[in-house]
Amino acid sequence: MVHVLMREFTDSFKSVRSILIILFLTFIAYLSASFLEDNPGLLDAFMSAQEDGASIYTGAVSIIILILGFLFVFAISHDVINKEIETRTIRLLVNKIPRWQIVIGKALGILFFWMITILISYIILTMISGELYLAHYFKTILFLLYVISFVLFISSIIPKSKLTMFLGILLGISLPVLGLISVSSEKWYFLPFKYLLPYYYMEDESIKLLIPLIFSIIFLIISVVIMKRRDL
């Protein structure tokens, strides 16, 4: 499993997209924070929605991930499982390690990549601003764990990588919109999105934060079951 984890981690960092995402995150977060600092009214509204001691810079990174996280993860990892099956490289892995270790190893490799990516952005912004708020980091990683597990689940049930690429763009745009709208909406048809997507649970630091973790575990278990039953 460690081999799968390290390969997935290094492959993610080798991609030009990963470097662009780090630069994009840091640059947009800095611009957003600078804009809010220049507009005291907006800054007060932003900080009133944050916990005491929160950093405007790290908060900006978290907001960007909440909005674009699905799109980012799909862009890099939409074919994390089905590409291995299409190219038949999965056969080399299943001869050496159990299938569940392949799924978990890939999930952890992608998660570690995002942990390092977000940490790099946080370090750069902390050096600029002198502010750091670790609660933002851990909530962002928890959100990304949900997204990674969901993307891996989609890549497990859909055999064609080109289809997951198209679906990834569609879901990467639509799910954040539906999730964020459902948080403040009382309409009955938004309720499934409110409770199945992680946005509602990210509002505070209560026990609700465990629910995205539970969903992540469920997605991974289903992915493992699918892999075990699939003829490779």
Write out the residue ranges for each language-model feature.
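Aromatic- and glycine-rich beta-strand/loop motifs that create alpha-glucan
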Residues: M1-L23, K160, D231-L232
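Selective transmembrane-helix segments that form parts of the transport pathway or gating/packing helices
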Residues: R17, P98-L125
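Aromatic-anchored segments of alpha-helical transmembrane domains
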Residues: T26-A33, W114-I124, L170-I181
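Terminal transmembrane helical anchor/hairpin motif
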Residues: F35-I56, T164, I169-L232
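Long, hydrophobic alpha-helical segments
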Residues: I56-K83
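Hydrophobic alpha-helical transmembrane segments of polytopic membrane proteins
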Residues: F72, H136-L163, L175, I214-I222
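Helix-loop-helix units of permease transmembrane domains in multi-pass membrane transporters
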Residues: I76-G109
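Membrane-interfacial helix-loop-helix connectors in multipass membrane proteins
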Residues: I120-K139, F143
